[in-house]
A protein has these predicted regions:
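Non-globular, low-confidence helical/coil segments that flank catalytic cores
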Residues: 2-8, 16-300
Length: 300
């Protein structure tokens, strides 16, 4: 019963919150103006971010300090079982939220077996529809399981953990292209900022720069490192220390494009790819630990 109440509360909050709503601003202010003791407590827990190896596709798992779990995309269909196995290895038998960034099959295909086999409290979607069989199968499985399905709004906050700010910087409303409709998330825990770009392209980057602060320590590079994303101007505004490139080895698309890799190198950004292994990160809000690379202080 407690779990059901939590889901209903989250759904009602998401339906009400938007960038300009007074309730959203009060909610976020309560997070960032907490008492000194409360702010100290938030750093006792860690936020864990796993950029999963799913071949030519995208899937990111986030375990928040309060234990809530959020999966962002699931890779292609054949990666679904791989993701499920990874969740089991981490002791996860339930997902509090799935974020479906946009309807391309290399992002939502793997969500089909995940939704079939694992309890999910809520699915957050870009709002972009598509005519593909993969998309219709995905939606039908959600309906069959009776999982709440919400299209997010730009500027909206996703209140899964009171100590973590998760803001939507882009959605699929009124967007023609699937990639342009990608949900973009900025996640902040303490001093640690993660910017997850989905398949957002340069046009989306330009729009985001007009509205939001994009500075982040970790940039999940847009569209698998394609030349259509990650402009010079955008990199300068984000100023990341670390860049994650999600792609499969020997993929037919040439991802990541050498022009993007070159730009990231020129800015001295440390790059990690999911082509060979899952990239694991942890942060206490003060430092970031990357796999076996050890503790990395945040440069603020």
């Amino acid at each position: 019963m407690r779990g059901i109440r939590s889901v209903l509360l989250l759904v009602s909050v998401l339906l009400c919150f938007s960038l300009n709503s007074a309730s959203a601003k009060r909610y976020m202010m309560s997070i960032h103006t907490a008492s000194p003791l409360h702010m100290q407590r938030q750093h006792f827990g860690k936020m864990k971010v796993s950029f999963l190896k799913v071949g030519q596709g995208d899937a990111t798992l986030i375990i928040l300090p309060n234990g809530q779990t959020m999966l962002i995309d699931g890779g292609p269909y054949e990666a679904g079982e791989v993701v499920i196995q990874k969740l089991i290895e981490k002791g996860i038998n339930h997902l509090d939220a799935i974020v479906s960034t946009h309807p391309d099959m290399d992002h939502i295909g793997g969500l089909i077996p995940i939704v079939e086999q694992m309890p999910v409290s809520l699915i957050l979607d870009s709002g972009k529809t598509y005519s593909s069989l993969t998309y219709h199968t995905y939606r039908n499985h959600i309906k069959k399981r009776g999982i709440p399905f919400i299209s997010v709004k730009e500027g909206q906050y996703i209140p899964l953990d009171p100590h973590v700010s998760i803001q939507v910087l882009n959605n699929g409303k009124s967007k023609d292209e699937n990639n342009e409709s990608s949900i973009v998330l900025k996640i902040r825990y303490g001093k640690a900022d993660f910017l997850l770009m989905g398949d957002a392209d340069v046009r989306t980057e330009t729009e985001i720069l007009k509205q939001f602060d994009v500075h982040a320590d970790v940039l999940k590079v847009g569209h698998h490192g394609s030349y259509t994303s990650t402009s010079e101007r955008f990199i300068k505004k984000v100023e990341p220390q670390f860049a994650i490139l999600s792609y499969g080895s020997k993929n037919p698309y040439g991802h990541p494009h050498q022009s993007v890799v070159r730009r990231l190198k020129q800015h001295g950004i440390m790059m990690y790819g999911t082509n060979k292994r899952t990239v694991e990160m942890e942060t206490d809000g003060e430092h970031i630990t990357i796999g076996s690379s050890g503790l990395m202080p945040l440069l603020k």
